[in-house]
Amino acid sequence: EIHFTRTMHGIMRNITHFCSRTKSRTWGKDGWQKIVVCIIADGRQKVHPRTLNALAAMGVYQDGIAKNIVNQKPVNAHVYEYTTQVSLDPDLKFKGAEKGYKPCQIIFCLKERNEKKLNSHRWFFNAFGRALTPNVCILLDVGTKPAPTALYHLWKAFDQDSNVAGAAGEIKAGKGKGWLGLFNPLVAS
């Protein structure tokens, strides 16, 4: 759940940044209403129970209601939808409006079977993309911690030039507290 909360909390910080852009024609205080976070878990048996607990704590997931067969037909995925008012930081502390965080619209798709990453991308684009018709899609792997303004800068690349079809952000290795992560040769390189 640490990897998940690191990513989700980073997204929530970015949503707060979008909403702080009061002079923007697009964003502003209600900018969170223009953002939908889609979380796709690849396999009900594979997703870590603590990640599901984190989603439940945010109000997104309800344990015990997913069934693998309905009307004698196998279920492919379970979809949960919720607008959460709280973020769960990597230390598993709740942050909400009292800390300046904005609400976040979340769609959580729990796939019944582990069918790998490309299948999850198909779910995102074919199912949710068609339903939501977004102007911009940003894909993040779990564990990626976006900087507080990173998603805004990615969005801005699309906003400034309608010919832009893709953009990539810079990835930096987390050095850890006191830069202790640098003792790991993979991080240090």
Swiss-Prot record:
Its EC number is 2.4.1.16. One of its GO terms (cellular component) is cell septum. It catalyses: [(1->4)-N-acetyl-beta-D-glucosaminyl](n) + UDP-N-acetyl-alpha-D-glucosamine = [(1->4)-N-acetyl-beta-D-glucosaminyl](n+1) + UDP + H(+). InterPro entries: Chitin_synth (IPR004835), Chitin_synth_fun (IPR004834). It comes from the Eukaryota. Its main location: membrane. One of its GO terms (molecular function) is chitin synthase activity. It holds the Pfam family Chitin_synth_1. It is a multi-pass membrane protein. Signal peptide: none annotated. It is found in: Cell membrane. Keywords: Cell membrane, Cell wall biogenesis/degradation, Glycosyltransferase, Membrane, Transferase, Transmembrane. One of its GO terms (biological process) is cell wall organization. Polymerizes chitin, a structural polymer of the cell wall and septum, by transferring the sugar moiety of UDP-GlcNAc to the non-reducing end of the growing chitin polymer. Belongs to the chitin synthase family. Class II subfamily. This is Chitin synthase 2. It comes from Ajellomyces dermatitidis. The lineage of its organism: Eukaryota, Fungi, Dikarya, Ascomycota, Pezizomycotina.
